[in-house]
Regions:
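A general secondary-structure boundary signal
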Residues: 17-19, 35, 95
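Helical "lid/coupling" subdomains associated with nucleotide-phosphate turnover
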Residues: 45-74, 78-134, 149-293
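Gly/Thr-rich phosphate-binding beta-strand-loop-beta motif of the actin/hexokinase/Hsp70
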Residues: 1-30, 124-161, 202
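Conserved ATP-binding subdomain of kinase catalytic cores across diverse folds
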Residues: 27-44, 72
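Acidic/polar N-terminal loop/beta-strand segments that form early-domain functional surfaces
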Residues: 18, 41, 84-85
Length: 293
């Protein structure tokens, strides 16, 4: 079975096309056939003006048309498309969603932050982890950060905070926003031992690649602090030149590190696992679960 997931984020949109094969015991394996990322950067419009501009509307439409062609070319049987923080906040989101549906047949669901947090966990990372530990999923995006806390393999807490990389770049995160996150972490992680962070999102994936760590090995908080100092001390142009970062990654990587570091500090966590999965992976698994229910 071929499935596809479209994630229209605040910084970029992604199309993930996966092949699902099932073994004799009925256990599915998900193989990535293609992942296409387009830096739409919707948040720069929405967080300033409250709506998606004419230029960005054109960009999204062209991107969705390309995605529709690719899904046809790959013979995708079922697909799902969601939009997150920037689209949630856009006054003209219904108009944009309707136009895309009429011209491409892609039906975009604008999902809540809490549902976004649950979908990250659908990637089933925790199934392969030590049940004696507690895990805090930290998904940092352009418009929001989703926190999902598991203890003894059970969901204890999940919440979406309006703290994201583009909001930080635009100075749109208040002290009250940070305080809300700090108190949530203190309240829910108080007295919990052996809590390990699991980081998802394009920025932490990039840091993991730069670190040259082997898959499955954690990033220590001190290493993240070093990267934060290093990137903060140079210009966006230097980050592009010295670290081979894309322009749409080079400006958001510092605020992303700031968010991860604050969360690790407030949650008393020293290590972060980076499974290199994201919302699109969770969406594909969610779609498969629905298709086979």
């Amino acid at each position: 079975m071929r499935l596809a997931a479209i994630d229209i984020g605040t910084n970029a949109s992604r199309l993930l096309i996966s092949e699902v094969t099932v073994n004799g015991e009925g256990v599915p394996t998900f193989s990535k056939l293609n992942l296409i990322r387009v830096p739409l950067r919707l948040g720069f419009d929405v967080f300033e003006t409250g709506e998606i501009s004419k230029e960005k509307k054109h960009m999204i439409l062209q991107t969705m048309k390309a995605y529709a062609h690719l899904m046809n070319a790959y013979g995708v049987e079922k697909s799902i498309a969601v939009a997150t923080s920037a689209m949630r906040d856009a006054r003209n989101r219904d108009e944009v969603v309707r136009k895309i549906f009429l011209e491409t047949g892609i039906n975009i669901k604008v999902i809540s932050g809490d549902f976004e947090a649950s979908l990250i966990y659908e990637s089933h990372v925790a199934e392969n982890l030590n049940a004696n530990n507690n895990y805090l999923y930290v998904d940092v995006g352009g418009g929001s950060t989703e926190l999902t806390f598991f203890s003894n393999n059970a969901l204890v807490y999940k919440h979406s905070f309006k703290i994201g990389t583009i909001r930080l770049l635009k100075n749109m995160v208040t002290d009250a926003d940070w305080q809300e996150m700090k108190e949530a972490l203190r309240d829910n992680l108080r007295g919990q031992k052996n809590t390990i962070a699991i980081g998802t999102g394009g920025n932490i994936n990039k840091i993991f690649s730069l670190s040259k760590k082997k898959d499955g090995k954690p990033l220590h908080i001190d290493l993240l602090k070093d990267y934060y100092k290093e990137f903060s001390s140079c210009t966006v142009e230097d980050r592009i030149r010295l670290y081979n970062l894309r322009p749409d990654r080079a400006d958001v990587i510092v605020p992303a590190l700031m968010i991860y570091l604050q969360i690790m500090k407030w949650g008393n966590m020293e290590e972060m696992l980076v499974p290199k999965i994201g919302l699109a992976d969770g969406l594909v698994q969610h779609l498969y679960a629905e298709a086979t229910a």
